[in-house]
Every structure is written in C-alpha cells, then in structure tokens.
Amino acid sequence: MAGSATVEKRLDFGLLGPLQMTIDGTPVPSGTPKQRAVLAMLVINRNRPVGVDALITALWEEWPPSGARASIHSYVSNLRKLLGGAGIDPRVVLAAAPPGYRLSIPDNTCDLGRFVAEKTAGVHAAAAGRFEQASRHLSAALREWRGPVLDDLRDFQFVEPFATALVEDKVLAHTAKAEAEIACGRASAVIAELEALTFEHPYREPLWTQLITAYYLSDRQSDALGAYRRVKTTLADDLGIDPGPTLRALNERILRQQPLDAKKSAKTTAAGTVTVLDQRTMASGQQAVAYLHDIASGRGYPLQAAATRIGRLHDNDIVLDSANVSRHHAVIVDTGTNYVINDLRSSNGVHVQHERIRSAVTLNDGDHIRICDHEFTFQISAGTHGGT
C-alpha cells in the first residue's frame, strides 16, 4: 500500500521531465540508462507489482540477452543500495512482489501524482463555478512539468506511448486552465499562451475554441474570425475534415456578434470532465477497474498496468493471434485521470468509435475499439469482471 513507506527522509520522484529521484530535495544519481529505465518503470507503475518479464521487455524489447533476468535483479539491488545508503529502508520502499517488484510510495511524492491530484481538484472546482480556485489548482498542476516526459530515456520504446498519453493530459489541463481564466474575466491574459499552444498542437479543437473565445471577449473580433479560418484550413488540408460542431457554433455566434457566456461554458465543460473522472471511482469509493471486453468471445481483458500493450507477439499484455495485427499494434495508458489509446505505427491502424485514430485518443466508458478483425468495448466497472 502507498502508505506503507513511512520514512523520516523525504523521498521524491519525477517523471514529468528527465527521470529524477531526490532525497530531502537533493538529487540522487540513479545509475546507468538501463538501471534508470527500471526505476522509471517502477515509478510509472508505483504501488503496483511490475513483473520481471515486463522489465525485460522495457529494456530490450524483442532481443533480451541470455542474462537479462539476472541483470534486472542486479539493477534492483543497486537501486536498493542507493536507498539504503540514504537512510531509507529499501525493503519497504522497493519490495519483492510476485511476479517482480513494487515501488511503494505515497502518490504525492511523485510529480505525476501531484499533477493528477491538482488537475482533478481544478476540474471539480470549475464544475462548481469556483473559477479562481480552479485556476490555482490547474496552474499548480502544470508547474509540476519540468520538460518532456522522461526526456533522458527516450531511446527506450516504452517511453514514447507513455509520454504521448501524458502530453494529451497536459493539453487538457492547459485548456481547462485557459477556460477558467476566461471565466474569471482575464481573457486577454491567456491569448499569448493559447497562440503558442495552438501552434504546437494545431489539431486540438478545444484549444482553438478557447483562443477564439479569448480574442472575441478581448474585443478582437477580426482575430477571432481569422483564427477560425486558420483552423478550418488546417483541418481540411491536413486531415480532410471540417471543424466540429462546437467550433462551428462559436464562429456563428461571433459572426452575429452575439454575447458569450464564458462562465456557463466553463461549468458545462468541467461538468463533462468530472463525469469522466468519476467513472474511475465508483460511489462505493472503490477504485474503478478498466477492461477491454472482446465482443466476439465475451472475454474481459483487465487494464491493470500503467501501460497495456496490444499486438501479435507474445510479449504483449493482450495477444491477438492474427496475421493482420502488427507485432506491437497499440497501447492503452492509464494517465491517472484518463485512459489513452495510441497506435504504435501499426500497418492496419486502430479504430475508435468507427474512425481510424491519427494520434492519441482519450477513451470513454462504452467506446467501441477495432483492431483489424478484433472488436472490443472499453468498459470501466467496479469490482471484478466475470469475463476475465
């Protein structure tokens, strides 16, 4: 359990930037790249067992050396020595937990855990109409980011899908913060940030919605209309699609010079996000469990790890025995607030809600997923799942 690691010294871990381990605020060098990759996997999956086989796959993918298992044990032993040398009981913090090891730490001793907590608090505050409080929480969440996720370990393939999913979560936090700031009457203050974000993420329509709203509420109607034309052209030229109904309706209101109710809009958006967050924790207070329900067989595949890989090879968490499925086809990442699916450059793609995904997509309870001939329903439910 997370509360089992009661120590006098302050142990802290960072994933939202280069991997970081500090004790009482002092950075602790954590060894070779492979040893740091083991630590990263343990922090990503904190308070959950990580199998030795999963660690081997993370380090060597399909080509582990003959001594891979012994190397994993050696890396863990070295990490324990680092902890012990700093006065922390390594057998409590980094314990054997079949089929591997578990890093037991409070969630608030990891930057990702703090990001999730602050983002969740901010969204709940916005849904209740407390926009100043929402802005403070969301700003605190974004301050946890020091740079690209695990930037020093990008050579390891497990990092990319995890980082991509967290960037999705970060963009959502930026969007929610901008909406809260606009609801507080500070539309002009967020324009520069939103201009930079829409340049970096040109297909994220919610960011464009906030930028266009901020322009309009700052008496810059021509800029608002120009921004709509830009996103419409970008979506058409690059993706072959039109803006969604929210953006189209916003543009129509601006053309007619109608007033915008920023507070009502912010509460509505946040309330929808709260519904998604609350799916994770049922009324009983038990942590929700996510599954992929195989429509053909009725089998339920639990999504228990921080990242669940799907593909043809047997080193995947969910193995799909089909020639059309790529060796490593897709991954579903639990970011702490959302489940995000990402196509791992597969040959035949991943379809969510009957559309092929072009980037990471946040899953909602009940979503239909198709991977070649295999069809699933994404489900979040409390307790055990009878189809496993």
Curated annotation (Swiss-Prot):
Residue ranges: DNA binding: 2-105
Source organism, top-level taxon: Bacteria
Keyword Mitochondrion: no
Consequence of changing residue 312 to A: Abolished phosphorylation
Residues of the FHA domain: 308-357
Protein's GO biological process: phosphorelay signal transduction system; positive regulation of DNA-templated transcription; regulation of DNA-templated transcription
Effect of residue 348 to A: Abolished phosphorylation
Function of the protein: Positively regulates the transcription of the embCAB operon. Exhibits ATPase and GTPase activities.
Family (UniProt): Belongs to the AfsR/DnrI/RedD regulatory family.
Protein name: Transcriptional regulatory protein EmbR
Organism the protein comes from: Mycobacterium tuberculosis (strain ATCC 25618 / H37Rv)
Gene label: embR
